[in-house]
Each structure stands twice: as C-alpha cells, then as structure tokens.
Amino acid sequence: MTAVISGFHTPVERDCLEILLRGRQPLVICPARSIAHIRVPMAWKKHLEDGRLLILSPFESKEMRVNATLAERRNRFVALIARSILIAYAALESRTEPLGLDLLQQGKTLYLLDHQTNNHLIQAGGCLISKRLQAALLGLL
C-alpha cells in the first residue's frame, strides 16, 4: 500500500489528514520544523503505536517555529522522498511554481488539478488528475 506524505499544515491539508486517519494507508507527517519537542495529538497516538503513522522532519532541534523558508525546505524534502507529487495550486511566480518545474526536470511524476493556475506546469509536462479523482478531492475541500 502506498504511503501518503505531506506537511498537513494548511487547513485543507489538516481536513484531508483527518479523513486519511480513518483509512488504512500508511501516513507520513512532515512538519516544517523540528520534531524534537513535538506534542503528539491524541488522534495520532494509536496510529503511531500501530506503525501506520510516521512523523519525520529534516530540521534540527533549534528550528522550533514554522516559517516560509522552512516550509519550502520541507516541501523539497517531501518531494525528494516521494515517488509522485500532487500540486493543487501553483500560480506563476509563486513559491510552488519553481518546485513543480524542478520536479518535472528530475523526472518525478507531478499530478495537477485542472485549473488555469496550473496550465504552465501542465504544458511543462505535469499530468492532469482524472475528472473523477478531482471531483472526489474537491468534495473533501
């Protein structure tokens, strides 16, 4: 079974995590900070004990607060270990755009929602997710 890996930081990502925790697939949570002193939410504890959930971070213990730079570094870390990546929104000149272009240059499979903000990444070689999957994802939002 394929693991789902994400920072699960934004409100939408946290909603997705809540749904994924009800499933059976392995999950990897990568906060954009150190996990040295992390308080594990009760909802995660059983999944950690069962070996279904892993909390992973590339950051040293001094990196205690999430910021844009750490989030960008975390996103690159997640992309490095992921086989395929879903980007929902990558506007031109956003912080996500260069990551998407780099992933395509590295030969990673990059999935994108069918939205005008992603057209440049689609034209660069990104893959549209199916209409059915997109409808299911948008139903979660």
Identify what each model region corresponds to.
Residues M1-L141:
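Glycine-biased, small-residue-rich flexible motifs in mid-sequence functional cores and linkers
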